[in-house]
Amino acid sequence: MSLIMALSAAASPIPSRPEKRCGWLSNPTPGNWWLRDRQAEWTLGTQGSEPVPGMDDLPDMSTKGWVETNGSHGYGCACLTVTTDARTKEVTRIISGGPVPLRQCRADRRLPRP
């Protein structure tokens, strides 16, 4: 029994610590959301999947600039405090966040373009 518990504990992901990530927040089509920062592209949600916890609590992201590329869908610049799974590059929880001016992302030369 203790072997089973040890193996299941080893297979369980270790929860990450909250971290602030800033970059391009993309919503190209309904239900699809990514945040691209200097380190990676982080998946927040994909069409047909359950939204990541905290997603519904985010404020309107189009208040500080939003580039529409597909109807009301598009991208903007945002800072989010999140927990992540570094292996899968998925956001596991959104703690807080909000839009920031587009110029912040545009000025960051180490940030890939959306």
Sequence positions of predicted segments:
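Bacterial N-terminal signal peptides
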Residues: 1-8
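N-terminal secretory signal peptides
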Residues: 12-69
